[in-house]
Amino acid sequence: VDRLPFELERPQNAGVNSIMLFGIPDHKDEVGSGAYDPNGIVQKALREAKKQFPDMYYITDVCMCEYTSHGHCGVLCGHDVNNDATLELLAKTAISHVEAGADMVAPSDMMDGRVRAIREALDANGHYGAPIMSYAVKYASAFYGPFRDAAGSAPSFGDRKSYQMDFHNRREGMKEALTDVEEGADIIMVKPAMSYLDMVSEVSKAVNVPVATYSVSGEYAMVKAAAKMGWIDEERIMCEMAVSAYRAGAQIYLTYYAKELAKCMDEGRIG
């Protein structure tokens, strides 16, 4: 939290007006209690950020994996995630984020029914206008590796394929997107971006809400590594990746290149 002024001043000066916050707590436990602690890392960061940079738009990741000692996205029952028990904790997390100053919450856990649970909980606590960006079309992808290493959120056993989608599957992605809109999602996200632009295109034609896509850590790392070796033009690749997402139908693009893209847009190198 003490680094917030430095970390937020740079994107704001670059012309970035929206950021997403992820939390890595000092202590993790079986039920991820740090996720919904009113004095948790994200909650503290939101309160401080709102004071120092009130014009920035703050979106928060709502999930348990960074907070659980086992690295899974919910409460365990044996070696399986208990979907319904997890919904209650996700709703508590979303409420705590909004009450700390979040402008939007983004559940990324992939539990069934979590958008409805969060929407009902927010409304019951008077947060009727708080929007939800749902990670509706989230695939079990190898592209997440660098983020999981940085956040220390890799599962200690098994994997997340029981609640994230098989990357072969198109129909399930469409079904999830439509279901989450019915449950109250204001924005639908497709994740990852680069290898799933077909889904960005299809979802954008099927839903009546904005579509976001997330260019994840593995995509960023590949470009960085290839650029370091002198094999590619990093800036041109970065711009092509962003434009391809918008061309496919995305209206929101989440990226680790936000500052650099903002500069390119400001200088008229991309539209």
For each feature predicted by the language model, list its residue ranges.
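Alpha/beta enzyme core
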Residues: 1-271
